[in-house]
């Protein structure tokens, strides 16, 4: 549960990634136009937590690349009908300037011409779709969502969907515990077996259900966003070594964080995980999920 009393953490941060790690893809970075970022930060200041690095999109990319991150997955979401095309054009323009950025399209479920909006985004080079149920307040079983599933599946594009119940806020216009249930995600995975789905935050707070679904469905991935930080009041966060190793991706939620940019990657580096598992978590699984085809001459590290 989010509340305005969640604190900033004054932890120290370094100017580069920890040593001896495989190449790092951050699979969960938010990129918005400045005006929308300002609105997002105002919301967090009021209802969430203090954000340490309030940076614009270009500054975010420079910040992370300069500190050793090899590749970034740029995420966005449309908070209302009518803004999706503009957001998709914005993300596509960032991708044309940064070859180490893979951008996701977005759409407001149920808005007019939603399917064509996504197809246009794919034609601009965007590699998948990001939706946020808490903000967009959609029913995952609705016809408008089924249309999105079909478009993504038909075009081989993955769907990153904040479908977990947490972190929720009373400021949302809908109740995430009502509209976000692991059973709903299970239906999507079953009905659209060719659709690759990533649920962020390890599926918080239905960790056990999502861990079981990882074993049952080859089209489900999870990301670690904020779950390694020991910040949110979530109980029983699973150990990464207990989860299906080829279906977990590292992500941070940068820049919308109340702590050091490298808090989670440091903790990951201290877990003494096998190098093969680290490689999967930090880049191999993201390359597979997002179907990122790197130039053979490019150096991921």
Per-segment meaning from a language model:
Residues 32-35, 79-82, 109-113, 136, ...:
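Active-site environment of divalent metal-dependent phosphoester hydrolases
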Residues 28, 91, 121, 129, ...:
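Conserved, mostly hydrophobic/aromatic
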Residues 10-21, 61-62, 118-119, 144-155, ...:
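Short amphipathic alpha-helices and their capping/turn segments at secondary-structure boundaries
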Residues 3-7, 70-71, 79-168, 218:
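Active-site gating/metal-coordination segments in enzymes
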Residues 24-34, 160-164, 199:
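Histidine-centered catalytic micro-motifs
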